[in-house]
Amino acid sequence: MNETQLTHLQQLEAESIYILREVVAEFENPVMLYSIGKDSSVMLHLARKAFYPAKLPFPLLHVDTGWKFREMYEFRDKTAKEYGFDLKVYRNPQGAQLGINPFIHGSAKHTDIMKTEGLKQALDKYGFDAAFGGARRDEEKSRAKERIYSFRDRSHRWDPKNQRPELWQNYNGQINKGESIRVFPLSNWTELDIWQYIYLENIDIVPLYFAKHRPVIERDGTLIMVDDDRIDLKAGEVITQQKVRFRTLGCWPLTGAIPSQADTLPAIIEEMLISTSSERQGRLIDSDQSASMELKKRQGYF
């Protein structure tokens, strides 16, 4: 079967598998960043296909903040156990000792210390020279201009004005000692592509993506699910039960839910076809500062 006979999703799958294999062939110590979300689940599925029947030739890394949804932790541990993945979990020890959290310290400081600095510490600790991430270009404007091979200096910083050309699926992976790259095999996928692929490949995902009655509060126009007793209720806030789901997942105090009746994959796909808003509108960390995502990426965020 030649390329012209492949379906749209098959072409995307083939491109992603090519990128995964190319990185493993080029780099000495790659790792896959596993955030437990739908994109991570698709990327992990593609990696299993790329190297089947062998085990994955790299570990998974989850940079934990201590504030993920409980269902995410359960799904992470179940997945690692079921497939026998080498899962490394890292949490910024200084941030944990100081009790950094989104309620007291705010989303910007929480993200910088527990996510960005935590990721940089983990990459340095294990000496990884390439890190797969599940980011897509359609998610956010700073990601739209980022290459598939995203080069980082010795401090893990990204310079959007210093990117290498990527012509005809040729990727230049030459780096100096101490430098690294972030690799995005799903760059050319859209949110709809992800959901259609999950449906066609029957990929297991966190149940939070499906609509269900959940305890939520409304804060600054965003529905926040109350996942545990660490919630810091403000005056006038009342916990109510609403049927909601999540289009994107992160730390639960910083992730907005959407009202939805979509409790099956076909219903989610139908919802995506008529949606006019970005999936990351519910990620409060994307709007906590001016040019927030690009600033975070320049500092070392994935």
Curated annotation (Swiss-Prot):
InterPro entries in UniProt: PAPS_reduct_dom, Rossmann-like_a/b/a_fold, SO4_adenylTrfase_ssu, Sulfate_adenylyltrnsfr_sub2
Biological-process GO terms, alphabetical: hydrogen sulfide biosynthetic process; sulfate assimilation
EC number: 2.7.7.4
Catalytic reactions on record: sulfate + ATP + H(+) = adenosine 5'-phosphosulfate + diphosphate
Matches recorded under CDD domains: Sulfate_adenylyltransferase_2 (cd23946)
Gene3D superfamilies in alphabetical order: HUPs
UniProt keyword annotations, A-Z: ATP-binding, Nucleotide-binding, Nucleotidyltransferase, Transferase
Entry's Gene Ontology molecular function annotations: ATP binding; sulfate adenylyltransferase (ATP) activity
Biochemical pathway: Sulfur metabolism; hydrogen sulfide biosynthesis; sulfite from sulfate: step 1/3
PANTHER family named in the record: SULFATE ADENYLYLTRANSFERASE SUBUNIT 2 (PTHR43196:SF1)
Family under the similarity heading: Belongs to the PAPS reductase family. CysD subfamily.
Role, per record: With CysN forms the ATP sulfurylase (ATPS) that catalyzes the adenylation of sulfate producing adenosine 5'-phosphosulfate (APS) and diphosphate, the first enzymatic step in sulfur assimilation pathway. APS synthesis involves the formation of a high-energy phosphoric-sulfuric acid anhydride bond driven by GTP hydrolysis by CysN coupled to ATP hydrolysis by CysD.
Subunit composition and interactions: Heterodimer composed of CysD, the smaller subunit, and CysN.
Protein name: Sulfate adenylyltransferase subunit 2
Taxonomic path: Bacteria, Pseudomonadati, Pseudomonadota, Gammaproteobacteria, Enterobacterales
Gene: cysD
